[in-house]
């Protein structure tokens, strides 16, 4: 079965808001074994939406729309879908009762234009909205159908899960199941070279790579009658991949991550909590980014003792006990200073682990010997200190971000050895 997703709204078309609805729907439809080959975004324009319906239903069995179900004049998705199928709208009394009850409970007066939200084609399946005023609907004709859902993600997701998903399950006898591996420390090109034969030889399951900022995701997807059978197909492929690049895998599972974000910090924080190892952080060039990454994880307060930003030499000496001679001989950006920072913050707080960053984030301040992008990171753990030197490319933001993630990944590796 084939479906298409149409996002309706000029605000999406202009980039004023991020369209997360399509991502959610694509994943949900895939899990039902429904194929999605096209997604479209249309502004608040009836003629263009009619054209989009026509093109989509030539290629697919049904269309799901989000947005355009509000009370204003430019909310026209339902009306346009009805026009496309040649169906007239009429008052849906159960929806009117729900709408009137909503306004009574909230103590607000219902505007006249809210009435347009309770008109539907006679044979439409009306979908109750438990989180807003705009019901959805399923409009059908000649074996094709259009599902119209509200635009606000909270309303759309609830309506899909409560009403649409059960409706669609009658049309599917297979399901798609995916297993996700998230990797750090290897680029997409090198990863592809490592597992290219696995990618090429697979039909079910399939293997796909997705590059994000500073990390790569491997998605293994199988089609089967049920989840158990799908995972049976996935397991040998997953094991084969891990035998080659397993050292780069920092977490697995279908975790939804926004562009530019990562689950790496959660993986590290989880290890710290599970192993009950306390940690203290001393930062210079990253300016608190390491600490803020770790404390996003629920329960981290049981092991995270302190994070300090020691930007100046004076603060490095006073707060961390970095020797004046070290700073004078080697400089603030040096292996020796990074080591003393990590050891100083750990010993001062009696933490099991101390980590540190010091570097030149730019755009100025670099020299031939110490260029912009030079960063030293150190980890004090089990009485030993591991120090790394990196020269990162990019602007100030990216250098700080890469330094943070590289340090967290190295910490993950050390924790997994314990």
From Swiss-Prot:
InterPro entries documented for this protein: CinA, CinA-like_C, CinA_C, CinA_KH, Competence-induced_CinA, MoaB/Mog-like_dom_sf, MoaB/Mog_dom
SUPFAM superfamilies, sorted: CinA-like, Molybdenum cofactor biosynthesis proteins
Pfam families: CinA, CinA_KH, MoCF_biosynth
Transmembrane segments: none
HAMAP family in the record: CinA_B (MF_00226_B)
Membership in a protein family: Belongs to the CinA family.
Protein name per the record: Putative competence-damage inducible protein
Organism, scientific name: Clostridioides difficile (strain 630) (Peptoclostridium difficile)
Highest classification ranks of the organism: Bacteria, Bacillati, Bacillota, Clostridia, Peptostreptococcales
Primary gene name: cinA
């Amino acid at each position: 079965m084939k479906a298409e997703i149409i996002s309706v709204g000029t605000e999406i078309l202009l980039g004023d808001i991020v369209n997360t609805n399509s991502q959610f729907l694509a994943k949900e439809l895939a899990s039902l074994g429904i194929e999605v080959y096209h997604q479209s975004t249309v502004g608040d324009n009836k003629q263009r939406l009619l054209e989009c319906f026509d093109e989509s239903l030539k290629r697919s069995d049904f269309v799901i729309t989000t947005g355009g179900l509000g009370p204003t004049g430019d909310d026209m998705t339902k009306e346009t879908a009805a026009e496309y199928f040649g169906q007239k709208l009429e008052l849906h009394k159960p929806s009117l009762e729900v709408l009137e009850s909503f306004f009574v409970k909230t103590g607000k007066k219902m505007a006249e234009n809210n009435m347009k939200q309770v008109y539907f084609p006679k044979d439409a399946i009306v979908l109750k909205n438990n989180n807003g005023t705009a019901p959805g609907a399923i409009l059908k004709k000649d074996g094709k159908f259009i599902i119209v859902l509200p635009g606000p993600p909270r309303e759309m997701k609830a309506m899909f899960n409560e009403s649409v998903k059960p409706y669609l399950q009658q049309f599917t006898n297979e399901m798609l199941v995916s297993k996700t591996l998230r990797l750090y420390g290897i680029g997409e090109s090198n990863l592809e070279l490592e597992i290219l034969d696995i990618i090429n030889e697979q039909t079910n399951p399939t293997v796909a790579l997705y590059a994000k900022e500073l990390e790569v995701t491997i998605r293994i997807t199988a089609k089967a009658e049920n989840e158990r059978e799908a995972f049976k197909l996935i397991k040998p492929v997953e094991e084969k991949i891990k035998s080659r690049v397993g050292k780069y895998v920092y977490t697995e599972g279908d975790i939804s991550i926004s562009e530019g974000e990562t689950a790496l910090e959660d993986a590290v924080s989880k290890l710290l909590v599970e192993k009950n190892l306390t940690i203290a952080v001393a930062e210079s060039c990253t300016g608190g980014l390491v600490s803020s990454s770790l404390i996003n994880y629920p329960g981290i307060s049981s092991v995270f003792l302190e994070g300090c930003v020691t930007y100046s030499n004076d603060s490095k000496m006073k707060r961390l006990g970095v020797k004046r001679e070290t700073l004078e001989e080697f400089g603030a950006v040096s292996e020796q200073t990074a080591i003393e920072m990590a050891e100083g913050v750990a010993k001062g707080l009696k933490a099991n682990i101390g980590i540190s960053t010091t570097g030149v984030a730019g755009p100025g301040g670099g020299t031939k010997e110490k260029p912009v992008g030079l960063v030293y990171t150190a980890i004090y753990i089990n009485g030993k200190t591991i120090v790394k030197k990196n020269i990162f490319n990019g602007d100030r933001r990216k250098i700080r971000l890469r330094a943070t993630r590289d340090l967290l990944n190295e910490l993950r590796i050390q924790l997994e050895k314990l």
